Amino acid sequence: MKFFLDLLPVILFFVAYKFAGAAPDDSHALVAQFLGAGISPSQAPILIATAVAIAATLAQVLIVWLRHGKVDKMLWVSLAIITLFGGATLVFHNPTFIKWKPTVFYWTFAGALAVSALLFRRNLVQKMLEAQIRLPAPVWQRLNLAWIGFFTLMGFLNLYVAYGYSEEAWVNFKLFGAMGLMLAFFLGQGFYLSRHLEEDAK
């Protein structure tokens, strides 16, 4: 349930983009009604998908708050970023802002991990996971560095796809490419950690 909830905005963004692209006339009319004239039919899918992503993230925050009585800081950050960059895309009718949104989020997360470790001597990855697993301090440090490196690279990769390929290719990458890479990263991390968990058990 949590995994699906985490992916909800990305999934709905993808679905909305595809549905809007399949009905260009209706999509264009809808966007023109709410955002005004001067919008080309080709802009409608990304604008509709952006509005859906903002609404989905708001719903995500509300669901988490109703279920748990609190909301994680990174989810608040995600809501702030999608509202700011998605809102700019809707106001200025420019997809550049929403294309930068994943990169800003990835780099914000990587930056928080790095600053916390360097300035405050706090390992945020350890803080997130230590209730579930026990690891030696050097392993926690390597894990923190791996997360910083991975999310920094993901930020660059998002920009590469956004500016090097078509808008539709970027939308596909957001769901399948980025999520696939994250899954591979966490699976690889699991294999790496399993060795240290076995050693700790011995």
Curated annotation (Swiss-Prot):
It is found in: Cell inner membrane. Disulfide bonds: none annotated. PANTHER family: INNER MEMBRANE-SPANNING PROTEIN YCIB, INTRACELLULAR SEPTATION PROTEIN A-RELATED. Keywords: Cell inner membrane, Cell membrane, Membrane, Transmembrane, Transmembrane helix. It is a multi-pass membrane protein. It comes from Azoarcus sp. (strain BH72). Belongs to the YciB family. This is Inner membrane-spanning protein YciB. The lineage of its organism: Bacteria, Pseudomonadati, Pseudomonadota, Betaproteobacteria, Rhodocyclales. Plays a role in cell envelope biogenesis, maintenance of cell envelope integrity and membrane homeostasis. GO terms for cellular component: plasma membrane. The chain crosses the membrane at residues 3-23, 46-66, 74-94, 100-120, 145-165, 173-193.
